[in-house]
Amino acid sequence: MASLRLPRANPLAFTRWPVTVITAIVYLALLIPLLVVHHVVPSAPSSPPSGLNISEAWADLQVLTNGFHPYNSRRNDVIHSWLLRRINEILDSTPLEQEYRALDEEKPDVFVFDDVYSNLTTYGGTLKDADLGVYFEGTNVIVYIRGWEDDTEHWWEAPNGVPTSRGGVLVNSHYDSVSTGFGATDDGVGVVTCLQLVKYFTTPGHAPRRGLVVLFNNGEEDFLNGARVYSQHPISKLPHTFLNLEGAGAGGRATLFRSSDFEVTGPYMRSPHPFGSVLSANGFDTGLIASQTDYVIFQGNMGLRGLDVAFMEPRARYHTNQDDTRHTSKDSVWHMLSAAVATTEGLVSDSTDRFDGAPNTDGGVPSGSGSQAVWFDLFGSTFVLFQLHTLFALLVTLLIVGPLTLLFTSIALTKADKMYLFRSSAKSEDRLDVVPLQGLRGFFRFPFLFGIPTVVTVGLAYLVTKVNPYIIHSSAYAVWSMMVAAWVFLAWFVSRVADFARPSAFHRIYTLTWMYVLSWVSAVIATVYANQRGLAGGYFIFFFHAGIFLATWISYLELFALPSKTEYANQLRSVSGRASGHGSRRGTTSGEDDGEEAEEEPTESTSLLGSGQRTTFANYVRVGGDNHAVAEEEVIDPNVYGREQAWSYALPKWTWGLQLLLTAPITLIMVGPLALLTISAISQTGQDGGHPLFAYVAIAIFTTIMLTPLLPFIHRYTYHVPLFLLAVFLGTLIYNLVAFPFSDSNRLKLYYVQEVDLDTGVNSATFAGLSPFVKDVSQELPSAAGQTVSCEWHTKRRNLLSCSWEGIAPQPVEGDHPMKDWGALKGNVVCLWSDHNQPGVLPALDEAIQFLPVWAAVTKGSDGLVEGRRAFEIGNDD
């Protein structure tokens, strides 16, 4: 058997080793930085800007988090007093007036409001429970730094007073924690950031143009009460824009969760390390993210325009005792602080009227309205921001221009007689000879090439969900590795089988054409959602579609390098004539399509010119003579790869690299961060009752999108990488099916509450969590020994099992028996206890924390850790 030896001088040729090495380098060169950006927080500077002190902020965070401080606790009152003292210390340390005047500015007036008077009653539709009503008395701390364009009067002291200056800026954080968490990230970092903002904007050189209101609200963890009651304070009429600082994880980077519009998002571009995507905002808009922050009060109820910046992972530490300073860092503090300073400085220095206008909610502030925005970061260092209607215009343009460009190119190819696509044969100039082109070969590969790996990865999602549904909680990258390895190996295997059975030089162009059609349909869907529902999360589809269009167009332009079909037919007839030696025509064939239809099984001597001539593996042309006399002439062209069509010698050998660079990098850069952000956000939501299948299917979808750019080139891969990935797949599959899903660094949260019926004396401690783990943990507690642990499905937390046993009686406090006369009334009085700072007060909870396995954590299951309940009935006085 003769072997084909292609020239090795060109390291960019479309051959196996260049394709394997270059594609691997491109993917690794992008995936590694994306992973680093996602997991590594930029270092805090050794010398921060004037007016900021990171060491001071870290010391404040340590004080703030040295105990649980929910709204309903003594520790919360201690933090309230400490905040007032720290604010006064910062203000007392400001320099004299002369230092401000040296910088051509006035020292700003600062007003501190210890708001223990505002109160609010909310009920019905404003809360999650339509049957619930809440009366709340606030203990917010408000700092107002007067802008040098603000009114100089104390307008807030006048009855119904309103500011006459342009709207100010609100920066919000909450200083209460949950009863089971120290609140370092939720929301201690936000609180110390606000303290540093007070310091920064009272430092010479940073006096604000617009008034700045810094709010330390108390009561966010219970119905967002702190933000609600802030709306009752007169100073709430001043701000038109806001920045909300929040935490839903422990450490890491602070991401831009959402923003109200294009104009208010602009100042965030000043952040030295921007991070986030508008896709997360769409998650809130569509209801996929059910939890809320104070953002919804400021933007939805009060009509302000602003941004929501928050920490978002890992969720396993959220609202637990691992939300402490040990599990965050100064770098995380700096990441939020630097973003807050940049954004706030941009908002308070704005000199336009774009944040003033008609209220956009009933009774809201006159903040006007803005344009819908598209925004995302690039490698955590650059922030891209443009308006949604710009995305719509770009999508519509590309949807029209792309098909027309390919159509006109196809027409030009047809006129030049170089349209080999979909052509099974060609005729010579005298139209007497018909030679096969095999131009349809490879067209029907893509549905199998794309479909089989995708279906298998989705099937793996269902398999893991069935066998070990929560392994993603602690081993998300094992799931990623399994999906990626399976997808690449199957795509390579299918492509190699197809290439062996039907070798085709058109594999690349047909695959890109199919990809273009799919991306075009996706772009249509993204356009419809952007126009009708204002959802901008499909922005990545535009870039994905644009790259595929250009790569596809390049493949069509490559066809101009081919000889015309007539010229090619003449060349083959000339070769056939010389080989026969007697001028007879050889190898004439019908014009029937031989692309994907049944034909002679290809072997080393499969016919090149149909039934008359045969070619060896090395592209020999063998011409048979009459009466078994054989005359043979060898025609070898090293520019033809393998057993592909002979006319492919003229195709460029380097353009594949350009096509790879147009498809793979842009896909990874656009989709990679979304994949990491999305899976980080949802991989641990199963413990909250979310269905785990969603996370696995999401990984399968992201895997398919990010690896699809490999399909036009994967048939050129050597076997080394796919076989290695096959081994990775088998190993990770076994691990994902049998490994225990939780660990001490990725614990399972169990929701705890203790209920005491003061009439009957029934004392019930309850854990709610995933089955069967919650039952196993409950039965192992000493107080549950010898008892029958009662388990039933939770009525409010879907997919969670609630297990109860007779707990150790709480010893919160001794009290008296106040009496009051009412009219006819009956119901239940419920008292809550949330303070768990003193051992022995809640012995059942102390026991649970002490004896829980290392892979489980306690979090609050209700507003109180203990709920004391007593029925009452008061008759009529008469």
Curated annotation (Swiss-Prot):
Gene Ontology CC entries for this record: vacuolar membrane
Active site, renumbered: 220 (proton acceptor)
Transmembrane intervals: 17-37, 391-411, 443-463, 474-494, 509-529, 534-554, 660-680, 694-714, 722-742
Entry keywords, A to Z: Glycoprotein, Hydrolase, Membrane, Metal-binding, Metalloprotease, Protease, Transmembrane, Transmembrane helix, Vacuole, Zinc
Similarity comment: Belongs to the peptidase M28 family.
GO aspect biological process, one term: proteolysis
Residue positions binding Zn(2+) 2: 186, 221, 319
GO MF terms held by the record: metal ion binding; metalloexopeptidase activity
Localization (cell): Vacuole membrane
Residues marked Transition state stabilizer (site): 318
Extent of the signal sequence: none
Binding of Zn(2+) 1, residues: 174, 186, 246
Cofactor: Zn(2+)
Glycan-modified residues: 53, 119
Descriptive protein name: Vacuolar membrane protease
Textual note on the cofactor: Binds 2 Zn(2+) ions per subunit.
Bias (Acidic residues): 591-603
Residue ranges annotated as Vacuolar topological domain: 38-390, 464-473, 530-533, 681-693, 743-878
Coiled coil: none
Enzyme superclass (EC): hydrolase
CDD domains assigned: M28_Fxna_like
Cysteine disulfide links: none
Functional description taken from the UniProt entry: May be involved in vacuolar sorting and osmoregulation.
Disordered as annotated region, ranges: 577-611
Cytoplasmic side: 1-16, 412-442, 495-508, 555-659, 715-721
Chief localisation class: membrane
